[in-house]
Amino acid sequence: MKTVLIIDDSDNMRMTIKELVELNGFSVIGEAGDGKTGIGLYKEFKPDIVTLDVIMREMDGIETLKQIIEFDAGAKVVMVSAMGQELYVKDAIKSGAKGFVVKPFGEQQLMETFKKVL
C-alpha cells in the first residue's frame, strides 16, 4: 500500500484529502499543520507521496518543499493551491514539486495527479 503525508494548515483540507486518498487505497502515515512538523514527519517516514499546501503560516509550502527536496531529491510532492496562486505553482515546480492540484478539486483530479507522479 502506498503511503501519503498530508501537510496543510487547514484541518478541513487535511480531513478532505485523507478521506479521498484512503478511499483510493492509500495509507495516510502522517498529517502536519505546518511545514516544520511536515519536514520532520517526512524524514521519519519517507512516504511515497506528499500533498503540500502552498500558503501556510510560519513556513510556506515553497520553503517546506525546498527543505524536503534538500533531504530527498526524489521526493514526490504534489502542491495544493487555491485559484489565483499560479505564480506559486511555477515556483514549486522549479523547486522540485512533481505535480499540483488547484482547490477546490475532486477525487478524480487528485487521483489522476497521484497516478502521474507515482
Regions found by a protein language model. Name each.
Residues 45-51:
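Active-site beta3 strand of CheY-like receiver
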Residues 34-37, 60-63:
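Acidic catalytic/metal-coordinating carboxylates
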Residues 11-30:
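Two-component/phosphorelay signaling modules centered on CheY-like receiver
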Residues 57, 85:
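The feature encodes the CheY-like receiver
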Residues 105-114:
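C-terminal output helix
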